[in-house]
Swiss-Prot record:
This is Early 3 receptor internalization and degradation beta protein. The lineage of its organism: Viruses, Varidnaviria, Bamfordvirae, Preplasmiviricota, Tectiliviricetes. It comes from Human adenovirus C serotype 2. InterPro entries: Adeno_E3_14_5 (IPR008131). Residues 1-19 form the signal peptide. GO terms for cellular component: host cell membrane; membrane. Belongs to the adenoviridae E3_RID-beta family.
Length: 130
């Protein structure tokens, strides 16, 4: 995988050098002056001597190579969804919660007595003074 990345980088570095040696700079655009804005559309409407097929081929190769290069280096990047703990981060900021200190009863303090059950008189059950 590393060899293919190095090969693609070498192609990107060598491509401008090879193209500059084989083709001459376009001389027709030398007369296009950016200070004369009214002449720019007529100056750049001329037909190019380079075929459109070459332009599409070069753009397609560059898009393909940049896609392969991006896919090759993506696992080594530690950003975005590729981060180590990306799925553990909350999507919204967590509200600040102040922890309250719990009241701890002393160890040697006796517990409060349990509530006594209600008292029912025998006389109240029978309905009189028998």
């Amino acid at each position: 995988m590393k060899r293919s990345v190095i090969f693609v980088l070498l192609i990107f570095c060598a491509l401008p050098v090879l193209c500059s040696q084989t083709s001459a700079p376009p001389k027709r655009h030398i007369s296009c002056r950016f200070t004369q804005i009214w002449n720019i559309p007529s100056c750049y409407n001329k037909q190019s001597d380079l075929s459109e097929a070459w332009l599409y081929a070069i753009i397609s190769v560059m898009v393909f190579c940049s896609t392969i290069f991006a896919l090759a280096i993506y696992p080594y990047l530690d950003i975005g969804w590729n981060a180590i703990d990306a799925m553990n981060h909350p999507t919204f900021p967590v509200p600040a919660v102040i922890p309250l200190q719990q009241v701890i009863a002393p160890i040697n303090q006796p517990r409060p007595p349990s509530p006594t059950p209600t008292e029912i008189s025998y006389f109240n059950l029978t309905g009189g003074d028998d």
